[in-house]
């Protein structure tokens, strides 16, 4: 019964966004399951030969558990998007202490700290003690670098923000694929993780503020799968598809 209620909430939430969006395009696959066509790795020159983002068994895979000394490495969509509904699946591993995420409406700036990916990010946090952060929004824009949903002054987040209900699966659990939906329509941003709404946010005054306009992000840009500087991370992504709102 609980699962049925979750599905009803998801369908109703998506319907509201669709109703306000006007016409929609058809579903498109952003990852073909075979190679990284349509995606580019962006990193420091010293990391270029490390093959951090690869395709294995029909999924995009990142495994740096035994790798030292890497900087930030992003896998970035060639295309830009503004208003859309994005669906994907990700698989996390209990042995992975690192953090990942999906930046959206993002853009790389070569002039910042040797290169920086500006833009908001849907957080994906595998460590069990904080996996409830998954689906919340952290802003990687250079002048922000803070949680924007919930709105906090920096990267720190106390357990009082932990929801009463959340679902996070691991590969070790068997069917360990998590389902994530990201919907952006104007300044309305919604995330749904495994059938549970995690973010329902009016980003007016944030994603369209002077910092985001300066970096040309927040309203339109690329997707970027993220590996943090020095993180030991093991994660996989697959079934990445999108429907744009016209």
Briefly describe each language-model feature range:
Residues 22-246:
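Carbohydrate-interacting regions of secretory-pathway proteins
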């Amino acid at each position: 019964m609980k699962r049925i209620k979750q599905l009803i909430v998801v369908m109703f939430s998506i319907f509201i966004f669709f109703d306000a969006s006007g016409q929609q395009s058809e579903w498109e696959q952003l990852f073909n399951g075979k190679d990284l066509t349509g995606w580019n790795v962006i990193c420091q020159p010293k990391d270029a030969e490390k093959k951090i983002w690869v395709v294995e068994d029909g999924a995009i895979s990142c495994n740096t558990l035994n790798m030292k000394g890497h900087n930030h490495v992003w896998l970035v969509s060639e295309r830009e998007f503004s208003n859309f509904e994005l669906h994907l699946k990700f698989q996390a591993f209990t042995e992975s202490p690192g953090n990942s995420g999906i930046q959206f409406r993002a853009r790389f700036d070569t002039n910042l700290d040797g290169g920086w990916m500006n833009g908001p990010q849907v957080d994906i946090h595998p460590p069990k003690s904080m996996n409830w952060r998954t689906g919340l929004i952290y802003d990687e824009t250079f002048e922000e670098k803070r949680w924007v949903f919930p709105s906090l002054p920096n990267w720190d987040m106390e357990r009082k923000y932990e929801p009463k209900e959340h679902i996070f699966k691991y590969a070790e659990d068997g069917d360990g694929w998590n389902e994530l939906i990201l919907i952006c329509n104007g300044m309305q941003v919604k995330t749904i993780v495994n059938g549970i709404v995690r973010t329902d946010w009016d980003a007016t005054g944030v994603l369209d503020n002077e910092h985001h306009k300066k970096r040309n992000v927040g309203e339109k840009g690329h997707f970027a799968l993220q590996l943090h500087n020095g993180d030991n991370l093991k994660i996989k992504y697959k079934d990445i598809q999108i429907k744009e709102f016209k």
